[in-house]
Structures are given as structure tokens and as C-alpha cells.
Amino acid sequence: MNKTITSIVAALFLMTTVYAQNTKEMATIYDFKALNNKGEEVDMAQYKGKVLMIVNTASKCGFTPQYDGLEALYKKYQDQGLVILGFPCDQFKHQEPGTDEEIAEFCRLNHGVTFPLMKKIDVFGENAHPIFKYLTQQVPTEEVHGLKDKATMKLVDGLSKSEGREEGGVRWNFTKFLISKDGSVIKRFAPVAKPEEIEADIEAMLK
């Protein structure tokens, strides 16, 4: 009987935890957890005091070369407190079809990626990961400058909406969210924003 009661209590606790991760009331990014590409749980609270960049990635996208720029930023600022987390996603025209193991190997061999890669997830829709629901609620829009970039994002908008992306949702692969040392979501960068264009913001937040 005691074992049964214990099991019921544990199940209720798990359901409560899952529900909590899907609410809007989460105070900061540190209230969330995610799985890395090895299936291990990662508590975002471990990044308190760090500048955090969260990026949804893909291996077969026109923006995939941005892996190089992201890795360059990581190597340059890692010791100063920058953490980059890559969340692979296959929702945009199936541009990330591989397994987590295949994705990790691709990133290592082709782009020398050493920053942490997470388990492949959805970033919009019913099954969107709670972290991305939270991020897009905090910063639902991004600035795009220049006629060429605006034209690119207009095209991307149409494509992502055809995939079922909701208003305010992540518009394409390599959308970047920059989070301050206290867990505040400070800025959202469009896929067209190259990693090196974000460097000044990172430097300012690391001070």
C-alpha cells in the first residue's frame, strides 16, 4: 500500500513539474531544464552568472555556415563567461533530418563545434519546447536592418508560416536569443544576423 501511495505521489509531482514548465509564470530561464544530445538532463540554473546565447540550429540550411561564427565567439569569450547552447530543430523544411549523434558528428567534423549541443526539439507549435515558448514570449520580435536582410526574412516568413509557425514564433533556423547574467532575455536576433554582428552586444553584457 505504501509503495502504491508513493508511486501516486511521485506521478503527481512529475505531472506538476511538466505543467509548470509550460506556464508563462516561469520567472527566468533558470527555471527550465532540457536534455543534451546525449539524453542527459541539463538544469539551466547552472548558467547563473553567465551570458547565455540560445540558438536553434540545422545542418542543411543556408544559414548553417553560421556554426563557424558561433564557434569563434564561443572560443573567444568562453573563459569570460559566454555559454552558447545549440538546439537542433527539423521543423523548417526538414533541414535537420539526422539523429542527435549524426548532428553532433556533422558539427564536429565540418565546423569544429565545441559548444554544447542539445537534443533535437520543436521550437514552435503544440510540441514546442518550453524554453522556446518562454523565449518567444519574452521577446516576440526581432529587428532586421538592410533591404537585403529584410527581403530574405520576408521570404523566410512565408516559408515558416506554411510550416505552421504561429505569430511571434521562431521564424527560421539560427534565431538567436541573448540572455544576461541575471537570466533576463535581452535581445532576439534574426537568422540573417551573423554571429560576428552580435559580438558587441556580448562584450557589453560580459562587462
Question: What feature does the model see in each segment?
Answer:
Residues 1-4:
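Positively charged n-region of N-terminal signal peptides that target proteins for export
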Residues 81-98, 114-125:
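Thiol-based oxidoreductase modules, predominantly thioredoxin-like and allied folds used
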